[in-house]
């Protein structure tokens, strides 16, 4: 399902970039960060509702879509053909740095996994209330991404010379 969400996120990002925002990447990133932000806020208060699965699919689509938009196409746009490698390296480096920071954050705030003799998860990890820090940790980062993506709202890739 995550693979499908990723494919849909990439197609959605590319479609709205090309057809709605005239190939500008900033507005697409802003829309996707906005989806992440709204999703995290809604998830914080409704994490026990049955529609949370669909919300997670939409949020996964936004996360993977913005990653593809920023590390793929935007790096080519802003790095140019001669510097695209360094642009991708810098952007992806920050992606993995952010992933590492969030992994340590989640390890500190989320419940540890405990298994019974049959290998079934038991203990604090089974209580949905103990998972509230997960969307709460996403809110400030999605807001930061939204704010920063609005800074490049009007940036457009340079056309090729004929």
What are these regions (language model features)?
Residues 1-6, 91-95, 141:
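Transmembrane alpha-helical segments of major facilitator superfamily
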Residues 9-18, 106:
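Hydrophobic/aromatic and small-residue hotspots that mark the transmembrane alpha-helices
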Residues 18-33:
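Cytoplasmic membrane-interface "Motif A"-like loop-to-helix N-cap segments
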Residues 24-27, 106-142:
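A membrane-interface helix-boundary motif in multi-pass transporters
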Residues 34-48:
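C-terminal ends and interior cores of transmembrane alpha-helices
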Residues 43-47, 131-162:
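Multi-pass alpha-helical transporter architecture, strongest
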Residues 65-80:
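Intracellular juxtamembrane helix-capping segments at the cytosolic ends
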Residues 81-115:
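A late C-terminal transmembrane helix in Major Facilitator Superfamily
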């Amino acid at each position: 399902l995550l693979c499908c969400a990723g494919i849909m996120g990439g197609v959605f990002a590319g479609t709205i970039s090309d057809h709605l925002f005239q190939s500008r990447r900033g507005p697409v990133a802003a829309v996707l960060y906005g989806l992440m932000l709204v999703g995290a806020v809604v998830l914080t208060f409704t994490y026990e509702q049955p529609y949370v699965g669909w919300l997670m699919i939409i949020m996964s689509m936004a996360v993977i879509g913005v990653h593809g938009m920023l590390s793929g196409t935007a790096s080519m746009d802003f790095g140019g053909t001669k510097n695209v490698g360094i642009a991708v390296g810098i952007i992806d480096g920050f992606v993995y740095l952010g992933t590492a920071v969030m992994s340590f954050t989640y390890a500190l705030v989320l419940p540890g996994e405990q298994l019974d003799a049959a290998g079934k998860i038991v203990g604090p990890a089974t209580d949905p209330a103990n998972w509230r820090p997960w969307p709460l940790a996403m809110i400030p980062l999605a807001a930061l991404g939204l704010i920063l993506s609005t800074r490049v709202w009007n940036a457009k890739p340079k056309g090729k010379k004929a």
